[in-house]
């Protein structure tokens, strides 16, 4: 009888088995919601799958409750320790069943309603303590998976970024941020997706100065790409227009830390334009050269554009450049532009060629000397400023290529506008300036020829200029020079046709 009393009845054993099975089922099913995270292993105790997996919000050790009854054989065989083993197992199972998962505790503490104030909540500290106590294998992963369940990637980025600025939460937030990036890498999230999650699509030309940009670059370095620079450029191009990219790269080249990358991306951009067959006008506008006005030749972007056009249009790049410039600027602005470009050695050659194309276009269009004078806005200047204008030489070049006797044409037009006396003084003053000296000397000769052909003597000129009563240098200069001219011209005029002149000037009758 004593032996019978120590042996458990079959009914008791079966009841115990049923209780444990129920406990195990309840414990296993205690958390049913899933959180999608990337298939990476944290501390080597998370099972890895090929691409994605779904983790429950509880950590691994809280879920893996298997039916294992080492006491059952002893109970059946009649050992004396079955009762103690049974009690211990029941206690363990009951404790595990009552233990809440990190996600359950998160919700119990109503942390799911704190939004972006999560890290500043006192309840959050309690929850962290609970997770670290009951998730001994990988508490950080348990924390991250719970937060990932309740927050979108964008919201979590903002949450962790804010927490990193607070000393008390900086370390944890940094760890969780690392887990988030590692999760993206193993989940093979696209660079475009991560770029947008980090709100870099809204940074514009300041993208390179954002701390998030360096994080994104770090992500790109971990991602599998055969051409990292092209991959970076394509993502930037997905969210930003060409002109914004130009500003972005230009700004980034000013900082030493981003200069190399920005220069490489700028090169990729030009290569991409060339491969895509972008027009000179598109690139011109993207480089903001349509806003440079007359100082365009001094812009670093202009030299890049001319290089692009030369490579894209090898047959006649100068015409392509002029056509584009003419699309955005008027004739008078172009003339100023070319005149300014001719003053600098590095751009003198190109500016001269483009000016030649402009003058040829005017000639083909039948533009007159007077029309060109007005196009260059020379008609708006007082006589005292005419030869100071950088356009006077441009106008002279045009008249020279379109008329057989350009100096006479120019003098006639200027005389009608300013009068003989004023024009003579304007020309005399211009001979003292190196830039206009040659033109002024030629115009002086043409004016003197006109006077001579009209029969004006030096005395007539002195009377016209009131030399006796006028002691200014210009008046005396005009009187003296015409007197010399008249004497030589008279000698040449009176010399027989078959005798060559010596040190004189032949004047057509």
From Swiss-Prot:
Asked if Membrane is a keyword of the record, the answer is: yes
What is the residue range of the motif RxLR-dEER? 53-63
Q: What induces the gene encoding this protein? A: Expression is induced during host plant infection.
Localization per Swiss-Prot or TrEMBL:
Secreted; Host cell membrane
What are the annotated GO cellular component locations?
Answer: extracellular region; host cell plasma membrane; membrane
What keywords does the record list, in alphabetical order?
Host cell membrane, Host membrane, Membrane, Secreted, Signal, Virulence
First and last residue of the signal peptide? 1-28
Coiled-coil regions listed in the entry: none
Concerning Pfam families, the annotation shows: PexRD54_WY
Record-annotated membrane-spanning stretches? none
Q: Record's InterPro entries?
A: PexRD54_WY
Protein family (similarity comment): Belongs to the RxLR effector family.
Domains: what does the record tell us?
Answer: The RxLR-dEER motif acts to carry the protein into the host cell cytoplasm through binding to cell surface phosphatidylinositol-3-phosphate.
| Role this protein plays | Effector that enhances P.infestans colonization of Nicotiana benthamiana leaves.
What's the protein called, per UniProt?
RxLR effector protein PITG_16195
Species source reads: Phytophthora infestans (strain T30-4) (Potato late blight agent)
